[in-house]
């Protein structure tokens, strides 16, 4: 690429779902703005946006128990409703893009897949029933079903029931209108749209450094890994959507807003089967209940995944530890991220999360046979010869300073933006990709406060519930969801 004397309007660092989503929003709002995308690998969507690296796809808080904790005997559904509202905004934007012809063939990235929760034992069944009662009362979840009848659960997901002891107490909820999303395919479609409309994509280009110019723009130093040459680009606005690579780049930027933040990398593993006979008997995303004291990322689930038109089943995740911040990162990533301003929060997190450390150690030393036993608890007929292990992506949990504890480990995502709005980045993980649209709307609101009022009308045209809740009028909620389901070719 040639260096330009004129600064580009937008530089997107990282070719994943976040950069692709933000770029598409900006291109829809400001078609004449210049956009350049820099991806360090030879393809886009090869890290956390890749479907085989992504822990939860179609995240809508329909089946994940960690979003509905029980406190003082009451099930709290606030997190679940917030995440589901966010997912509805993502669906609305995708539906707009399909209608506009910007993203063709929705079945190539989103497919109807029921979401289920499955538990064993009387106490867990009673909890699931209370959760069901609390959620079904909300307009977003009124279509949820519950059963303790093995015959009914068998009709929903046969593999959960086959060869299970007849006297075992089991229970399940099902939300038939769930989805499976291939964020790798969606990312590629969005990047294709951007490049077809003037954006420049630079693969094998790694941003190595950046500094702010006197006029407020940013100067980026970029290495072309193919020719080992260095290029330099100036940009009016920079978004760092580089997954685990976002923290080091935000640290290099020197913005004060990144002080006190650290990252805790966690790797993952799956069991996967592509056997058509097994796959045909399970069409659902089924989440279980994490063991007492285990962290949220340990929730076991048996997932239908549709990638490239082919259906597979994944079970896991099994956590592990690697100091890399990216699957194809450096073993020095964690240690290189330590700064005087974040070492106290990091030490505080280590002190207060011994159960997480214990869990990771137990996962690291667990044999393949012991890990497979966890699958058999879900699927009694599971046979090791039908399944193989695959390595998932890296997720970097946010560690941040806290006035009371010194530092806390945050399960979720966090936008870090400079006060002047010239640069922003995204830290963290779950729910991540499924809520990419509302997260990137937050970036627009924080980084372009002088423009957001003028953008409100086109944003509302693209995302009808921008600024409002889908469930604000319970009578209209089903119709709103049905409209996106029809455009995205989802059975509902």
Swiss-Prot record:
The keyword Flavoprotein applies. InterPro entries: FAD/NAD-bd_sf, MQO. One of its GO terms (biological process) is tricarboxylic acid cycle. Pfam families: Mqo. GO terms for molecular function: 2-hydroxyglutarate dehydrogenase activity; L-malate dehydrogenase (quinone) activity. Gene3D superfamilies: D-Amino Acid Oxidase, subunit A, domain 2, FAD/NAD(P)-binding domain. It catalyses: (S)-malate + a quinone = a quinol + oxaloacetate. Its EC number is 1.1.5.4. Its cofactor is FAD. It is an enzyme of class 1 (oxidoreductase). It comes from the Bacteria. Belongs to the MQO family. PANTHER family: L-2-HYDROXYGLUTARATE DEHYDROGENASE, MITOCHONDRIAL. This is Probable malate:quinone oxidoreductase. It comes from Clavibacter michiganensis subsp. michiganensis (strain NCPPB 382).
